Amino acid sequence: MAAVSMSVSLRQALLRQRAVATAAVSVCRVPSRLLNTSTWKLADGQTRDTQLITVDEKLDVTPLTGVPEEHIKTRKVRIFVPARNNMQSGVNNTKKWKMEFDTRERWENPLMGWASTADPLSNMVLTFSAKEDAVAFAEKHGWSYDVEGRKVPKPKSKSYGANFSWNKRTRVSTK
């Protein structure tokens, strides 16, 4: 009987440990929720106290960027919408405006024969959702720009039967 009472006391001790562990876990969960709420309230209160600094005149930030002067003042960019891919019928890449930089000095690498350049911006293409955004970006950086208008293709209306016409040179002989 002593072994049975021992196991009962062990069971009771284990149940107490589980209850304490469950209570500790539930107690830990409540403060974390309160901590998140109080942190959010603290952050919300801080945004009300801050004030924005506004500057009326346009500031020149070129000394702060570290970009050489020749890459800023003498730069010309081309703003355009890319043409549709001729190999596919989709118009996926014709919705956004692209800005590409002019080609500066290039030379052929004598070892490998690759085209080399010292211009870090020559191979970079920027993408914009609107033409006005691209123009504003170019003006902000002091670049001169050329805008090429969007070319909308005119659909040619022809019937399916025109593909099999006998009097046109659309049919290809198989022999």
From Swiss-Prot:
Topological type in the membrane: Peripheral membrane protein
Swiss-Prot/TrEMBL keywords: Electron transport, Membrane, Mitochondrion, Mitochondrion inner membrane, Phosphoprotein, Respiratory chain, Transit peptide, Transport
Highest taxon of source: Eukaryota
UniProt-listed GO biological process terms: adult behavior; adult walking behavior; brain development; cellular response to oxygen levels; cognition; dopamine metabolic process; inflammatory response; innate immune response
Cellular location(s): Mitochondrion inner membrane
Single Gene Ontology MF annotation: NADH dehydrogenase (ubiquinone) activity
Descriptive protein name: NADH dehydrogenase [ubiquinone] iron-sulfur protein 4, mitochondrial
Lineage: Eukaryota, Metazoa, Chordata, Craniata, Vertebrata
Originating gene: Ndufs4
